[in-house]
Each structure stands twice: as structure tokens, then as C-alpha cells.
């Protein structure tokens, strides 16, 4: 077999392959055997029909077509390997020349992984915002803790913002109740929002026993987004009574003996959270700085596939939440054109980052072992609220392990870049990145996967996996 490659663009190549007729013989023999099992010829047992009889009964052309369908994919893969090409999608194959007893020629156009000239990624400089933690932030968290231990007291007065009401809701259209669009005995905090437009305004001023009708739009079901009349009936108005912020409350709500200790712990927890946020921002800023130094050609097929996947994910999340795209765009203050432009920008940045990190992983010759794969599987399972072993089984059964391997390798590459970077905050202080895990994620040391969490890994995953896994 002979092959040649023509570069059509930095992300697309054309292979021209010539296969001598002799190399088709195994596929021709296999085609004859398969056809012999499928036809009935008087005087011959099924599967024992000679090739010459098959040529007369079925036609030599049918045998050749079957052989070509068998041999072309094999020779395409051989040509990829011979020319060190990494395909990103299915090829467009065209048989350009073939006659019986003559060489087979075909071409294959395919999107390929771009070549990237890696810049020096040691000592990348980036800047992030200062950590801001005010007394008001701490007080807000302490107040939220008090609200968790609050009691509700019935009051005989009109409801005001911040009160709780027990209510019934019934949605109607043209005077007819809408199936599934009613609730009974629901406790709701006036002013909370996020339920029905107009509900909070209707509830303010209502007393126990009052009924009121207002217009709104349904946020779920088959009639989502349609205008309806909503009747609200209040059966109770309740005032929230917060516990006193004293040592007794601290002992009830926490493991601490005093309010001072409780408040100090809240401040420390908030501080850790802000430091983690800053570390994540530093990681992203370093990657952004490195991307600015390199040109990454993007295969449009990869961008398009990722765009479609993310768009579908947004649509599914909105449908699950009972929110229309129009309502979402209104809340975000975006037009559809702005949404699409922002989505495409983020997708292109993400795809460029993936290719860049793949190259770093390849240069550093990173691999992964069974323990790392197991830990990553457990973390992913915990993030999605699934049983680790069931999650691992699903990933193996559906051949998603290469994707997880690539995630780990990219994480290692990102960690390598960030660890060598110099990141400062707005005040010029060097940002500590000790909370960066080896896989590139951010977390506290105590958040690491517990050692006793074990899952069974298939033997094929036990060997080190190199960084050249395909996109």
C-alpha cells in the first residue's frame, strides 16, 4: 500500500491511498465465503459454493464491492498511522479508481488535530482580584444560620415582605382550572421571588382567609409561558421569630460554646471559600494568559459539535426548570444573538484550551495509573450524586473511559502550568495555589477522596495511558 497526505488547512488533510490488488485477496476470499453462506445453489451445500459459481449467480461486481467495503476502512487506518495523523471526525471517503485485477485508489478527507507551537509556559504571570471579606458578609452568614433555627408565629395582621404565608394556588384559563396547575397548603416567604410573576405583589396586604386573583404566566407544564389567571387563598400569616444571638444559640447551632467562637468559625469558613474562589480565578487567568501567546487553529467540526452539545444542555436545563428561553434571555438581559455569540466565544476558548493542554500533556509525557483513574471516577460520581461503582460500570460499558483519561491528562497539564506561574492579587501579593489538586481542580486537602472508597477497575485500565489519546 502507498499513501500520501495533502494538507488542506491546519485542521484538515486529504489522504490519497493506493492498494495493490494482491492486498485485496484476503477481503475477496472473505467476501466469497460470506456470500456462499447466504445463497442456495442446487448441487452445492450452503457455504460450499465455489467462487466461479458465485460469479455467475451473484456477479463478480457484488463480490468486489463487498471486498472494497471491507478493505477501505482498514487501509484508511493504516494510512493515518503511516502519516502520523490524528483524526477528529469521520472521514469523507471516495473511491477514485478501481477495476478488477487492478490497484484500488481512494481519497479520504478528514479533520485532524492541529499542530501547535507551544510557547514557554514556565513563569506565566497573571493577576486576580483581592480577596474581599467584610463584617457584613460574616453577619449575613450568621443571620442565615439564625433563620435556620427560627420559629414561625401566627399573626393576625396583613402579610408584609419577609412574612411567611400558608396558601393555596389555582391557575385557570377562561374560567377553567388547568390540570396540574394548583398547589395546596404551601408555605411561602413573601418577597422570596422565583415562583410566579405577580405572586409577591398579590400577597402583600393579604390576611388569613383572604382570596385574590392576579394574572401571570405558567413556568412549567405543557402550557409553559402562557398567560393565566391565578387565584391565591391565604390560610395563615406567620412572622419569623429569630433566636437571640447569644452563647446559648451558639451551643445549640454549632459545636462552639460562645458567639465569638461561632462568628470566628464563620469568618474562617468564608475566608477559605474566598481563597478557593481566588485560586480558581488564578488558574483560569494563567490559562487565559497562555492562550494569548499561542495561535490554536480550531477544527470547525469540533466547534460545531461542542456548540450543539452546550446549546442542547442549556435547553434541557431550562425545560427541567420550567423556564422558556425567552424568559431566560429576559432575566439575563441578553438578546438571542448576544446569547449565541457569547456561547460561541466560550466554546472556542474551551476547545482551544483543550488542544493546548493536550500538547502540554504530550510534551511532559504524562500518564495515569489505576489509582488516579479510580480517584477521578469516584470524584465524578460524588459530584453527580451517583454510586461510584455504578458510575464506573456505566463509563466502561459506554466506552467513556478515554474521555475521563483525557480529562485527567488535561488536569495534570493545567496543574503543571499553574504551579510554575506567578500570580499576584490587585495589591501585589503572591497568590498561594496550594489548594490546586494534581488533576487541575481546586479543593481543600480534606476534600480529597477518602482512601476507603474503592471501585473495581477493569484490567485494561491498569496500564499507564499516554497523553496522545484522541480528542
UniProtKB/Swiss-Prot annotation:
Residues 436-471 are annotated as: Disordered. Its EC number is 5.2.1.8. GO terms for biological process: 'de novo' cotranslational protein folding; cell division; chaperone-mediated protein folding; protein transport; protein unfolding. InterPro entries: PPIase_dom_sf, PPIase_FKBP_dom, Trig_fac, Trigger_fac_C, Trigger_fac_C_sf, Trigger_fac_ribosome-bd_bac, Trigger_fac_ribosome-bd_sf, Trigger_fact/SurA_dom_sf. One of its GO terms (cellular component) is cytoplasm. It catalyses: [protein]-peptidylproline (omega=180) = [protein]-peptidylproline (omega=0). Keywords: Cell cycle, Cell division, Chaperone, Cytoplasm, Isomerase, Rotamase. Its main location: cytoplasm. It is an enzyme of class 5 (isomerase). Residues 162-243 form the PPIase FKBP-type domain. The keyword Plastid does not apply. It holds the Pfam family FKBP_C. Belongs to the FKBP-type PPIase family. Tig subfamily. NCBIfam families: tig. Consists of 3 domains; the N-terminus binds the ribosome, the middle domain has PPIase activity, while the C-terminus has intrinsic chaperone activity on its own. This is Trigger factor. It comes from Nocardioides sp. (strain ATCC BAA-499 / JS614).
Amino acid at each position: 500500500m502507498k499513501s500520501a497526505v495533502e494538507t488542506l488547512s491546519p485542521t484538515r488533510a486529504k489522504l490519497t491511498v493506493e492498494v495493490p490488488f494482491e492486498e485485496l485477496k484476503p477481503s475477496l476470499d472473505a467476501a466469497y465465503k460470506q456470500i456462499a453462506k447466504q445463497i442456495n445453489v442446487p448441487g452445492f451445500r450452503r457455504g460450499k459454493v465455489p467462487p466461479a459459481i458465485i460469479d455467475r449467480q451473484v456477479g463478480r461486481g457484488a463480490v468486489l464491492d463487498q471486498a472494497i467495503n471491507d478493505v477501505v476502512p482498514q487501509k484508511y487506518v493504516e494510512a493515518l498511522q503511516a502519516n502520523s495523523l490524528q483524526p477528529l471526525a469521520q472521514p469523507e471517503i471516495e473511491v477514485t479508481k478501481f477495476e478488477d485485477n487492478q490497484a484500488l485508489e481512494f481519497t479520504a478527507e478528514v479533520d485532524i488535530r492541529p499542530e501547535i507551537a507551544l510557547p514557554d509556559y514556565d513563569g506565566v504571570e497573571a493577576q486576580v482580584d483581592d480577596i474581599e471579606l467584610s463584617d457584613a458578609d460574616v453577619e449575613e452568614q450568621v443571620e442565615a444560620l439564625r433563620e435556620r433555627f427560627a420559629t414561625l408565629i401566627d399573626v393576625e395582621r396583613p402579610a408584609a415582605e419577609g412574612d411567611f404565608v400558608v396558601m393555596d394556588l389555582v391557575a385557570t384559563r377562561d374560567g377553567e382550572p388547568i390540570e396540574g396547575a394548583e398547589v395546596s397548603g404551601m408555605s411561602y416567604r413573601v418577597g422570596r421571588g422565583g415562583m410566579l410573576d405577580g405572586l409577591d405583589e398579590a400577597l402583600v396586604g393579604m390576611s388569613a382567609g383572604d382570596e385574590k386573583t392576579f394574572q401571570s404566566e405558567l413556568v412549567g407544564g405543557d402550557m409553559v409561558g402562557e398567560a393565566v389567571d391565578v387565584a391565591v387563598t391565604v390560610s395563615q400569616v406567620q412572622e419569623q421569630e429569630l433566636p437571640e444571638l447569644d452563647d446559648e444559640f451558639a451551643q445549640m447551632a454549632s459545636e462552639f460554646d460562645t458567639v465569638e467562637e461561632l462568628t470566628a468559625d464563620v469568618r474562617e469558613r468564608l475566608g477559605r471559600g474566598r481563597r478557593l474562589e481566588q485560586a480558581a480565578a488564578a488558574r483560569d487567568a494563567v490559562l487565559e494568559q497562555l492562550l494569548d501567546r499561542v495561535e490554536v487553529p480550531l477544527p470547525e467540526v469540533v466547534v460545531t459539535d461542542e456548540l450543539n452539545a452546550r446549546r442542547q444542555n442549556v435547553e434541557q436545563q431550562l425545560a427541567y426548570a420550567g423556564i422558556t428561553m425567552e424568559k431566560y434571555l429576559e432575566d439575563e438581559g441578553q438578546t438571542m444573538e448576544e446569547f449565541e455569540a457569547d456561547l460561541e466565544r466560550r466554546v472556542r476558548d474551551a476547545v482551544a484550551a483543550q488542544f493546548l493542554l493536550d500538547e502540554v500533556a504530550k510534551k511532559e509525557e504524562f500518564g495515569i495509573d489505576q489509582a488516579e483513574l479510580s480517584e477521578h471516577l469516584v470524584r465524578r460520581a460524588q459530584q453527580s450524586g451517583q454510586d461510584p461503582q455504578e458510575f464506573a460500570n456505566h463509563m466502561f460499558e459506554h466506552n467513556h473511559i478515554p474521555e475521563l483519561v483525557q480529562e485527567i491528562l488535561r488536569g495534570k497539564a493545567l496543574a503543571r502550568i499553574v504551579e510554575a506561574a506567578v500570580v499576584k492579587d490587585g495589591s501585589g501579593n503572591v497568590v498561594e495555589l496550594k489548594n490546586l489538586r494534581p488533576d487541575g481542580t481546586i479543593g481543600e486537602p480534606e476534600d480529597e477522596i477518602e482512601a476507603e472508597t474503592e471501585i473495581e477497575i477493569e484490567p485494561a485500565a491498569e496500564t499507564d495511558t499516554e497523553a496522545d489519546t484522541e480528542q
